[in-house]
């Protein structure tokens, strides 16, 4: 239940809402997403959920009409996280394990595949590094195969892993302004 409370608090958080507003008002070519379809894996993760929030707000506020197919493992988390969009015809959540082939006959062409699913938990890297990297490889292959089968113009992969760097030991929780250090040879 703690995760669900954090999700609700994030959506209602004024700093988070300010970040979303800064992004949608930034002079980016949002019109290139007009009447397009996106498939986003890792929908309930850091990058995926923020991107979905931005696109769905652009749909509501600016009539972008961009269909979002969102993939994730936990439907309950998705229902809580995206409750504001769950009934929209422009949003569809699909419960999916990135390790499995993704074959859907109910999805037509998709313009962009954004592969944002990855196990970024440090314990997983430490206790099962091969399983963790294998999931990343298989997941990427599955998304590329889907992109080809559905004639996507682009397929992009990204991760937020260690976006703040390692804790220097001077704080208990990370904040947006925190800049730790990143050591590329640590797992």
Residue positions per predicted region:
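N-terminal Rossmann/SDR dinucleotide-binding element
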Residues: 2-112
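Short glycine/proline-rich turn/loop motifs
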Residues: 32, 117, 121-123, 176-183
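Phosphate-coordinating loops and pocket residues in cytosolic domains that bind phosphorylated ligands
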Residues: 35, 80, 126-127, 134, ...
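SDR active-site strand-loop-helix element
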Residues: 41, 71, 113-119, 155-161
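Glycine/Thr-rich phosphate-binding loops of Rossmann-like dinucleotide-binding domains
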Residues: 48, 102, 123, 165-166, ...
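Short amphipathic alpha-helical segments
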Residues: 51-53, 82-83, 126-128, 168-170
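NAD(P)H-binding glycine-rich loop region in Rossmannoid oxidoreductase-like domains
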Residues: 95-135
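Conserved Rossmann-fold NAD(P)-dependent oxidoreductase catalytic core, especially the SDR/UDP-sugar
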Residues: 141-186
């Amino acid at each position: 239940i703690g995760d669900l409370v954090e999700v609700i608090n994030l959506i209602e958080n004024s700093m988070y809402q300010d970040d979303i507003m800064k992004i949608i008002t930034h002079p980016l070519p949002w019109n290139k997403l007009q009447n397009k379809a996106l498939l986003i894996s890792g929908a309930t993760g850091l990058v995926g959920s923020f991107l979905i929030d931005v696109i769905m707000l652009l749909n509501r506020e600016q009539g972008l009409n961009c269909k979002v197919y969102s993939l994730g493992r936990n439907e309950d988390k998705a229902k809580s996280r995206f409750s504001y969009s769950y009934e929209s015809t422009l949003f569809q959540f699909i419960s999916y394990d990135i390790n499995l082939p993704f074959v859907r006959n109910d999805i037509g062409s998709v313009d962009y595949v954004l592969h944002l699913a990855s196990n970024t938990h440090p314990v997983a890297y430490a206790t099962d590094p091969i399983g963790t990297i294998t999931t990343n490889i298989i997941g990427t292959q599955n998304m590329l195969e889907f992109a080809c089968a559905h004639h996507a113009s682009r397929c992009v992969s990204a991760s937020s892993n260690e976006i703040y760097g390692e804790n220097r030991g001077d704080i208990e929780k990370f904040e947006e302004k925190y800049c730790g250090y990143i050591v590329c040879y640590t797992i």
